[in-house]
Amino acid sequence: MAIIQLSNIKKQYENGILVIDDLNLTVADKELLVLVGPSGCGKSTLLRIIAGLEQVTSGELYIDNERINNREPADRDIAMVFQNYALYPHMTVRGNLEYGLKNRKTPKDEINKRITHAAKLLQIEPFLDRKPRQLSGGQRQRVAMGRVIVRQPRVFLFDEPLSNLDTQLRAQMCIEIKTLQRSLGTTSLYVTHDQLEAMTLADRIVVMNKGAIEQIGTPMEIYDYPETTFVADFIGSPSMNFLDRKTLEQHLGHSLSYSQETDLLAFRPEVILLGEYPNQGAVFHTQIELIKPVGTGCHVLTHWNNNIFTIEIKERLTHDYGQKLSFTVPHQSFHSFNKSTGKRTREN
């Protein structure tokens, strides 16, 4: 069992730069929680604080109700996987796996038992006698994960472990990490700037921006109900399309039934209906700026009233650049926000 609690965490450097500001977060036992956000949002710093590699300016850290602020990293029972594999090049895979256990004076029989178990889980049994230079990038990352698995810690921390891998291998490793974490049941925090990784791996996602939490929720909650314009823009590929409420009302010729504070609307690229359906939603007559083929469909950048929209079409277009394209956004597919606060609003 490992429940992580962060209470009023603040991290400010001596030069005055505030990295994390009054952050509160609880990670449930056996949960895989993913921290996602742009570079500089504080996600990796938060991970390093939990690991004990950075000290907090103020706030409290607990694991299973035990305060760990002043504990040394080695005494926190936490294992961390980094972006760089950090394997010892002169040692075999087996040597890398057993190194930490030997330092802790773990009995030899127990070491062999743990290595056998980890190697089987990670499918690296054939590579135990090889050196890291004889392995592919994906195999090296499995060995790096094996080193933390054999320790059997209370908590796993992953700091962008897949960012050095190509797209196809990254997708494969995401599935393997998710399967592995479920099998072991170890409470885990995973940091990434890649929203696709976050959506694939997470039980819950924490979206961070400028040292603060924008939203916490399941992948589908974050995607379907973004609480801020930042989340709406950051999560989703392509991201949401935004337009001014007054501009849309002028286009439609009537007012829309949103709360008074709503002055910004947004819609996902995939919700559109190709063609004109005025009884179902808002019809847009646009001009094609760019067509990006994606398998059997395409993403289309269109120009409308000084706005550039990206829409997703699940068929191949015969249109060309500069041609007209009409589509409809169903009424229920619009999200409503307030520009000043950046927060989601509710319909009347």
Curated annotation (Swiss-Prot):
Locations listed in the record: Cell inner membrane
Domain ABC transporter residue range list: 4-235
Gene field: ugpC
Functional description taken from the UniProt entry: Part of the ABC transporter complex UgpBAEC involved in sn-glycerol-3-phosphate (G3P) import. Responsible for energy coupling to the transport system.
UniProt record, GO biological process: carbohydrate transport; glycerophosphodiester transmembrane transport
Chief place where the protein resides: membrane
One CC-aspect GO term: ATP-binding cassette (ABC) transporter complex, substrate-binding subunit-containing
Residues annotated as binding ATP: 37-44
Membrane topology: Peripheral membrane protein
EC number(s) on file: 7.6.2.10
UniProt similarity note: Belongs to the ABC transporter superfamily. sn-glycerol-3-phosphate importer (TC 3.A.1.1.3) family.
Catalytic activity, reaction form: sn-glycerol 3-phosphate(out) + ATP + H2O = sn-glycerol 3-phosphate(in) + ADP + phosphate + H(+)
Protein name: sn-glycerol-3-phosphate import ATP-binding protein UgpC
